[in-house]
Amino acid sequence: MCGIVGIVGHKPVSERLIEALGRLEYRGYDSSGVATIFEGELHRRRAEGKLGNLKTRLKEAPLSGTVGIAHTRWATHGAPTECNAHPHFTDGVAVVHNGIIENFSKLKDALAEVGTKFQTDTDTEVIAHLLTKFRRDGMGCLEAMHAMLKCVEGAFALAILFEDDPATIMVARNGPPLVIGHGDGEMFLGSDAIALAPFTNDITYLNDGDWAVVGKTSVQVFDIEGNVVTRPRHISLATADLVGKGNHPHFMEKEIYEQPEVIARALGHYINVNDSHVTTTSTDIDFAGVESLAISACGTAYLAGLIGKYWFERYARLIVEIDVASEFRYREIPLSPRSAALFISQSGETADTLASLRYCKAHGLRIGAVVNTRESTMAREADAIFPILAGPEIGVASTKAFTCQLAVLAALRIGAGKARGTITDDEEQVLVQSLATLPGVMRQVLNDITPEIELLSRELSHYRDVLYLGRGTSFPLAMEGALKLKEVSYIHAEGYAAGELKHGPIALIDENMPVIVIAPHDRFFDKTVSNMQEVAARGGRIILITDETGASMSKLPTMHTIVLPDVAEIIAPMIFSLPLQLLAYHTAVVMGADVDQPRNLAKSVTVE
């Protein structure tokens, strides 16, 4: 959500700031802006809509200056208008902000009482006015910054310019991530390392509560009490070439087709094909001594965790508690120190998931983080890190991160079963060999089913409501398929457990309701066929996704049947996710939707 970049340099920065913002577009936004200091004065350009609109403004009215900040805004307080776009200016101060100031109404009222006039509907403007007030009260820039931070409550990442201090940018972090990049005679800042990849890979990650003064050749970091602190520098693995589309029209399509490659890389970290065993690392959780397991995540990551719940319960005989992170942390769950917790997040910065992680850590649980970004806050705060190694995922709708999360959870399920004595050596070998076939089968399926999915998507695009059904691990897949379709095509879709059909959804079924049934030939197949018969009896349009054995056994007429190869149970969820992803993608393309940046959505939700 939102993106922040800044440069303290020795040459003009406006074009480089816009270039860096382009690498943050995946985070979601609805307006953008840039500000620089030139000849002792602040200057800015802002625009509603896509970044191209801001580029046009800059062509019409270029900005000079070697120090500047820029921002992509995802509206939380105030409509997505140019007036509400960042940076916000008050006398001698420019502010960009990612997050939510929870006490802004109280602060706004207090400022209004002393004559402050507000120009926007945003919470961010409060920050600028506080800084201006403290400066007028006689405080220096550093003192005013510290005083402001003691006033505001909520989640925020900030970058601030002062006209009186034209050679620095002041920054702060409390929740949303903020990184500092060390260059050659210049310094950079951004919401993540990807934004800075063409400029530097020498990165300092700020901790929650940190604030800093960034100069041309150095950064001084303070904690919330104003004490100088030292934060380590890291070499980031993010590179600029990882965020291109290649030969694909959209990032989402590129990332769908990258899955065989990234799955192979992920599995290589967790299984040893030569001796058919899962690998152990120094960060493994000791599942043998764990009484129960808690899993928490948001969105697609939660659905990966739900599949993980089925696996850990059935094959490791673990009691598993799972909930969406926004609910998990408020339920006051009885937690035992002999329990462990897994938190799943592509970015490793998801606000609700991070809050749930901290809740469990405070209760003494051992924490595992299944993340795509090893330098993320969740990874740094966890006891055990389980990287999914998917590489940067730019499309807002998660595809390759989802299947990599499943691959990692599948390997962990084997390791947990071995540790707890519920999986034998022979069973481990069979499971590992099955996992090893996954990249090749994925590649085959993507090649085989794409043409028929393209045709089916044209028909599906004419409907406004779609129901997805599944049993067992296919139930979370049904919810994931529905989520993908609604995210990128804006078609209303819901995923249900097939056994719940008679408890409500069946009332909606008629000839205008496509019903996508996910039915591998497993122990649930016959019951799922019974549900399909109920749909057919009411005129529902069945789209069946099954395997070769299932297709040979189902005699019901369908609108379309997608036939996948027979595969081992452990890799079936990853294989069956592919037609769901492709169907959502191609339907959205047919409908002319913005596939990579769906309306109102953000890739990384860093506020609650």
UniProtKB/Swiss-Prot annotation:
The lineage of its organism: Bacteria, Pseudomonadati, Pseudomonadota, Alphaproteobacteria, Hyphomicrobiales. This is Glutamine--fructose-6-phosphate aminotransferase [isomerizing]. PROSITE patterns: GATASE_TYPE_2, SIS. Residues 283-422, 456-598 form the SIS domain. InterPro entries: GATase_2_dom, GFAT, GFAT_N, GlmS/AgaS_SIS, GlmS/FrlB_SIS, Ntn_hydrolases_N, SIS_dom, SIS_dom_sf. GO terms for molecular function: carbohydrate derivative binding; glutamine-fructose-6-phosphate transaminase (isomerizing) activity. GO terms for biological process: carbohydrate metabolic process; fructose 6-phosphate metabolic process; protein N-linked glycosylation; UDP-N-acetylglucosamine metabolic process. The gene is nodM. It is found in: Cytoplasm.
